């Protein structure tokens, strides 16, 4: 049976299985969802067995459990290790959703729900391609699966798990569907990712909240101080001012800049899609270079003082911010983390206390386009989408990808099917049914090409 027919005859079942996963709110960041995490892992274990795995198990870690499964074809055949994650981001703000985030709906040819794309929908693509190959007797190499439950919080337990289970996870290449394409009719393969460093900043002033009339103008306001500190991290040219930050940043090669310049990109439509009137970033680089090949710094959240209804004239005792920096390959997140800690604490005035706490991070990654598995993925996209995919770097981070290379000694192929319009991490996350189908076709072709 051809793959298109198989998808058509089984799509209702595929979606029912996906929806059973989505209805389990596996939010790794919230301790209140610990039972949901275990339930989602167990559901994946069942689905992997039903798809054709020889064995599947839920394995403990220092945090949330992982799911491992494998299909053994031959000890002499190569092995593909499929990585995915079953945890999702919190759904807030709930009032911005057009439908319930954990009650999936199909509208306008798209699945709407938290995890529809990131990463339950994309994970299901991998599993259903595997299922088809097993049932049709087309699989010629070994396949292993490792699904983790902490990707959305920086994979804090996975590094130790990899080191403890190197033999179990031994493979020739890793396949990941957790990235995006340039467009529905513009398939692309991700050749690189940025790294990440993330901190929480706490600024403390007086020992209690003060009356802004009695003390305002005489006592430093921690929120004002925090805003001033953060405003100095980036200069007028969009460069990060932290000393030695750029020491390990390599200039984008001219050949790669030429490739990026050839990517179809409508800056006006880009601005319209995200609702901004102008773009801003590092001087001397294009928008696509800025958000993929160059480092960046962002304030992800800032709070303090009174934020309830009405007014309260208060000079707050504390102010907080969560900030992140996207890194490029060769920048080490631990080194960058310490540079930021040193810089912000040294910049702090003596009338407040500043505490900077690194939260999580990881290194960037680059995949060579001459790797046999990359070329198999390229042919997979061409078969399913009717055109050769563009090779692009992406601005997001999957910190564990660099750990795979360092610990397991193998490359990762980033064969993702998401779109920017899928609104991952945001209200109204969605995933195209058409791309879901084409994704299964592409992964099937990947495995068949990799056999060769």
What is each of the regions a protein language model found here?
Residues 59-61, 115-119, 390-396:
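Active-site nucleophile and cofactor-binding loops and adjacent substrate-binding regions
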Residues 77-147, 438:
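Active-site metal-coordination/substrate-binding segment of hydrolases
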Residues 102-115, 207-209, 383-387, 424:
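Glycine/charged-rich beta-loop-alpha catalytic/anionic-binding loops adjacent to active sites
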Residues 117, 207-209, 325-333, 362:
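A generic structural motif
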Residues 1-94, 318, 335:
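N-terminal helical capping/dimerization or prosegment-like subdomains
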Residues 116-280, 288-295, 404-406, 428-434:
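Fold-level recognition of mixed alpha/beta catalytic cores in primary-metabolism enzymes, strongest
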Residues 197, 319-321:
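Hydrophobic core residues within well-ordered beta-strands of beta-rich domains
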Residues 50, 183-184, 241-318, 329-342, ...:
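An extended, acidic, His-containing surface patch that forms the Zn2+-binding/catalytic region
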